[in-house]
Amino acid sequence: MKKVFIFDDNIEILELCTEILEDLGLEVKTSPTTNSVEEQVSSYMPDLIFMDNWLPDMSGIEATKLLKANDRLKNIPVIYFSANSNISELANQAGADDFLAKPFDIDKFEETVKKYTGV
């Protein structure tokens, strides 16, 4: 079973995304914080990561940079999602593989998940 990790401090977003992903047959883990992001991801080894920008402890940009600098984790696709669409270029520079603006279209969300997981 493919696994997805979602980092977002908005509980409603976490619940909505989890429901959609589980309906697609994916295993989901969530975290409202980027505290120990490398350890969190290493212990789960997801096939895909969704990363919000505004998170406690460190920004999604900084967390993405850490993940992409880690030899063990750098090949896991990171989809950046944020209400601030102006941040997409910074996310790209940090190593994000894709960007979704919030609020996101559910069909676009599912399409992005399928693109990166093959489900």
Question: Which residues does each predicted region cover?
Answer:
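Active-site residues of response regulator receiver
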Residues: 52
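Two-component/phosphorelay signaling modules centered on CheY-like receiver
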Residues: 11-29
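Alpha4 helix (beta4-alpha4-beta5 surface) of REC/receiver domains from two-component response regulators
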Residues: 62, 84-100, 108-111
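Acidic catalytic/metal-coordinating carboxylates
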Residues: 32-33, 59-62
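Hydrophobic/aromatic residues positioned on beta-strands within the core alpha/beta folds
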Residues: 79-81
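The feature encodes the CheY-like receiver
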Residues: 14, 56, 74
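Short amphipathic alpha-helix used as the core "switch/output" element in two-component signaling
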Residues: 61-74
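Acidic, metal-coordinating helix/loop segments flanking the phosphotransfer/catalytic sites
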Residues: 30-48
